C-alpha cells in the first residue's frame, strides 16, 4: 500500500499557457480517487504526468513517500489500464498477463503464481489458454486489469477503461471494479468523463475544468454542496437548475429575472442587492398548490422515463426542470404549482461563480 501526492504540479506545452494550473492532491493509502470532467479539461494529461509519460513543468509528484517527478515510468511502481486493451493478439490470456513480468526477469514459478491469483480474482481461470479474439469486450478488459494486477503496483492508474464497452457491460464492470478495489485495497487514480462512473466508484471525486480542480470531495459532498456553478452544472443528471437574479435589498428573498420571488433561508443579508445565481436540483422541487403559495410553471414538455418523469418549463427566458413521480403525468401547457424548499436552495456569486 502506498500514498500518492501531487504538490503544486503544472503543465505547459509552450512555456506560456498552463494547461494544468497549480494543482495539489493528497491520495491516502488505498484510496480510490476519480478525476472527472469534460474533454480537454486536463484529466488525462494529469494522469500521464503521474505515470511519467508526460513531463511535469513545475511541482512534484510523490509515490509511497518517494519523489518520482523525474523517474522513468518503469521505476515508479505504477500500473496503467487504458481505454484500449492493448492485448497481444498472438498471445493467450495467460501469456498476455505474464509478459510484463517475464521481460522484467521474474522467475517462472513466481510469474505462474501471480497470474493464477489474478485470474482467480478476475474469474478468468477458464480462459487462460484463449486468444483475445475469442473473448468479449468485458473479458478483454479484465485481462488488461489482470496484466496490471500481477505487477502488484503501489498505484493503479485507470484512463477511461470502460469507455469502449456498451452500456450494460459498463454497469457490470463498474461493480467488478468496486469489488476489486475492496479486495486489493490498492491506491487508485481513475480518469473518466462519465459522472456516473465517478459517483459510483470514487471514495473522493476531483472535478476538473480548464486545468483546475474545481472541487475535491466525496460523491455526496460534490452533489449536495457543489463549490461552483461548473460543478453544479456538471454533476447530476439532469443538471441542477441554475436561475439568474438578485438578492433583494433586505436579504430575505431571491428575485428571478422573470419576476418570480423566492424566500431565502436567512443569512444572506451581506449579499443584499447583489446579482447571484440560484440553484436547485430537479428532484428537490415539490408539487404544491396555488392555495399553499406555490409558484406557477407552465409545462412545455414531459419526458417519461419509467421510474420517474421530467417536466420542462420556463420562468421568463429561464428553463426549469422538475423531477416528478412516475404517476405524475401532466399534459403540455398545463400549470404546475411548485414549492422550492429554502433548505435546498444554493446561491452562487454572480461574478466568480463560486458558492456562497
UniProtKB/Swiss-Prot annotation:
Topology in the lipid bilayer: Peripheral membrane protein
Residues annotated to bind ATP: 37-44
Compartments, record wording: Cell inner membrane
Keywords tagged on the record: ATP-binding, Cell inner membrane, Cell membrane, Membrane, Nucleotide-binding, Sugar transport, Translocase, Transport
UniProt record, GO biological process: carbohydrate transport; glycerophosphodiester transmembrane transport
Main location: membrane
InterPro entries from the UniProt entry: AAA+_ATPase, ABC_transporter-like_ATP-bd, ABC_transporter-like_CS, ABC_transpr_MalK-like, ABC_transpr_MalK/UgpC-like, Mo/tungstate-bd_C_term_dom, NA-bd_OB-fold, OB_MalK-like
E.C. designation(s): 7.6.2.10
Source organism, top-level taxon: Bacteria
Molecular function GO terms recorded: ABC-type glycerol-3-phosphate transporter activity; ATP binding; ATP hydrolysis activity
Residue ranges of every copy of the ABC transporter domain listed in the record: 4-235
Quaternary state and interactors: The complex is composed of two ATP-binding proteins (UgpC), two transmembrane proteins (UgpA and UgpE) and a solute-binding protein (UgpB).
UniProt family annotation: Belongs to the ABC transporter superfamily. sn-glycerol-3-phosphate importer (TC 3.A.1.1.3) family.
Biological role stated in the UniProt entry: Part of the ABC transporter complex UgpBAEC involved in sn-glycerol-3-phosphate (G3P) import. Responsible for energy coupling to the transport system.
Protein's name according to its UniProt entry: sn-glycerol-3-phosphate import ATP-binding protein UgpC
Natural source organism: Escherichia coli O1:K1 / APEC
